[in-house]
């Protein structure tokens, strides 16, 4: 496949976002070109760390500093790039290929001046940010989508056993629940659905996950929604919740006693900020993110690419780590003018990182569909999701953990 344009002037390549996606692009470009100018812009320090470790680190007694593989400054020096840390992009002018910047420290009057920077090729690697429903005030709840917030929560939890409520029993929420339990905390996991992972798997599969979660000692509240969170006089949080209207007759339902907890973690999904994509004029889907051309990862605007959590391919958000290396290699080849075969998106294997139960999913799962049992026993369940012409579009394999030999 031919590259878009091999001409890159002194402005060089600008990457917005210093998460796994942004650094993967830098690694891929530097593997092919040691000298082309690269500028990395990030609202934080740009430190390199492996985000999936955040859901496993508290039980391992790892602090945020322990998870950092290289500081942003050291990584930038090693990669021969310019790092603009603690810097936010406020506007993209695609016609002039200019970005407007302001310091992320602008609460200090010293840092209120705007600056501009030009680009020849722009890579949007800005990720996605947590969704906070109205019932989950951002100033009262935590999220673990970023190492800085994780570090703040880890410091609070390191003082002793506490009661933590987690709202949302998807992959991340379910993993965090087990990690906190292993660390000695009391855990309540709340979800709108009757079982964890219900948005991607059928009830026959998720019921096994719910059983495993409960058997550990996690208090799973399925079929409930949080209605309010308030801080009370002793510093604890009062979590009010109610059964979903579809799950009970509200005329006969008895009031539910609120939970009293020390912390609340929101694990209620991710969304992509549309401000920069809109300014750049790129096609954008409010549900899935920046729309890209699958073989090249180019957006609809010339000289702009997207990668990672902020992008979508064929209407599907790409929010897994496994494909990042191949995506970055494609962008590197395309930017540098190298012939390449084009990126071929393959759904990654999804694995729940819980010890209480093994859950592995391949393909593109969805909760509702023609799921057929392939293998079923007390210790194992294998189901296939059949699509048109009975083609297998997804497979879930659930296994009970191996019993240690005594």
Regions found by a protein language model. Give the residues of each.
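Mid-to-C-terminal Rossmann-like scaffold of FAD/NAD(P)H-dependent oxidoreductases
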Residues: 3, 8-12, 310-405
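Short beta-strand/turn micro-motifs composed of small residues
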Residues: 17, 42, 168, 191, ...
């Amino acid at each position: 496949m031919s590259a878009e344009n091999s001409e890159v002037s002194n402005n060089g390549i600008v990457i917005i976002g210093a998460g796994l996606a942004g650094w993967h692009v830098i690694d891929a470009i530097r593997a092919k070109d040691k000298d082309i100018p690269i500028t990395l812009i990030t609202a934080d320090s740009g430190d390199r760390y492996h985000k999936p470790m955040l859901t496993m680190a508290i039980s391992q007694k790892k602090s945020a500093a322990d998870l950092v593989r290289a500081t942003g400054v050291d990584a930038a020096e090693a990669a021969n790039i310019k790092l603009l840390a603690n810097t936010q992009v406020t506007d993209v002018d695609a016609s002039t290929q200019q970005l407007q910047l302001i310091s992320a420290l602008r609460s200090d009057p010293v840092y209120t001046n705007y600056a501009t920077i030009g680009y020849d090729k722009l890579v949007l690697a800005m990720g996605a940010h947590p969704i906070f429903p109205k019932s989950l005030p951002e100033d009262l709840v935590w999220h673990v989508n970023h190492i800085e917030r994780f570090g703040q929560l880890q410091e609070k939890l390191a003082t002793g056993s506490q009661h933590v409520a987690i709202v949302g029993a998807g992959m991340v929420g379910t993993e965090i629940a087990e990690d906190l339990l292993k660390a000695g905390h009391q855990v309540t996991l709340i979800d709108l659905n009757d079982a964890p992972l219900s948005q991607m798997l059928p009830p026959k599969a998720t019921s096994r996950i719910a059983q495993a979660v409960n058997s550990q000692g996690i208090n799973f509240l399925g079929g409930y929604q949080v209605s309010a969170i308030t801080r009370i006089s002793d510093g604890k949080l009062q979590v009010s919740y109610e059964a979903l209207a579809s799950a009970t007759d509200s005329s006969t339902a008895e009031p539910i006693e609120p939970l009293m907890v020390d912390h609340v973690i929101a694990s209620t999904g991710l969304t992509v900020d549309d401000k920069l994509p809109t300014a750049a004029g790129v096609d954008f889907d409010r549900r899935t993110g920046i729309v890209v051309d699958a073989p090249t990862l180019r957006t609809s605007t010339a000289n702009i690419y997207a990668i990672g959590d902020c992008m979508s391919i064929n209407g599907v958000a790409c929010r897994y780590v496994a494909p990042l290396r191949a995506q970055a290699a494609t962008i590197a080849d395309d930017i540098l003018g190298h012939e390449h075969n084009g990126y071929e998106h393959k759904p990654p294997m999804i694995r729940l990182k819980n010890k209480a139960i093994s859950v592995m999913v391949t393909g593109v799962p969805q909760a509702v569909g023609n799921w057929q049992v392939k293998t079923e026993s007390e210790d194992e369940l294998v189901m296939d999701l059949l699509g048109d012409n009975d083609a297998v579009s997804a497979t879930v394999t659930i296994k009970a953990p191996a019993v240690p030999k005594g």
